[in-house]
């Protein structure tokens, strides 16, 4: 069974960013090769609607058969609101909380992001997962694309 990856908006932008491309492009190659199942949410779609054309083309280049589209629902909104109510992050980070809630509810194996301030942050991850467990969900692994690099065994 393929691992289920929820990729937030920052990773799509990172593909074209000099600072992040080195680690983002190999992840997309692995996605295109069908190594993972991509979880793509309505939140990500909405955020990318204003992105440059090359970013939107990157989205459409991914294979539909390896992608699950996930709508935002009341359960996700409630969980995201809970993260804020419990002060894991502030009110201005609601969209980030929605990404985490959707990934959690959709049983993603990993949420992948380049957002180190609000998402890929040890203290924040602890907070999100404490609330997930308190609400009957499993913990969510939150990583950056760098954690998905493959290395030659001869190195």
Question: What label would you give each PLM region?
Answer:
Residues 42, 73, 146:
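Residues at the C-termini of beta-strands that transition into short coil/loop
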């Amino acid at each position: 069974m393929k691992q289920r990856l929820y990729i937030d908006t920052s990773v799509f932008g990172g593909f074209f960013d000099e600072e992040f491309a080195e680690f983002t492009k190999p992840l997309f190659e692995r996605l295109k090769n069908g190594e993972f199942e991509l979880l793509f949410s309505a939140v990500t779609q909405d955020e990318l609607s204003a992105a440059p054309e090359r970013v939107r083309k990157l989205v459409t280049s991914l294979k539909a058969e390896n992608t699950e589209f996930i709508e935002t629902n009341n359960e996700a909104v409630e969980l995201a609101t809970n993260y804020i109510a419990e002060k894991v992050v502030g009110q201005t980070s609601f969209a980030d909380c929605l990404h985490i809630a959707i990934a959690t509810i959709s049983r993603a194996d990993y949420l992948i992001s380049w957002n180190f301030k609000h998402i890929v942050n040890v203290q924040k991850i602890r907070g999100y997962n404490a609330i997930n467990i308190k609400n009957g969900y499993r913990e969510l692994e939150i990583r950056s694309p760098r954690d998905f690099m493959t290395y030659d065994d001869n190195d």
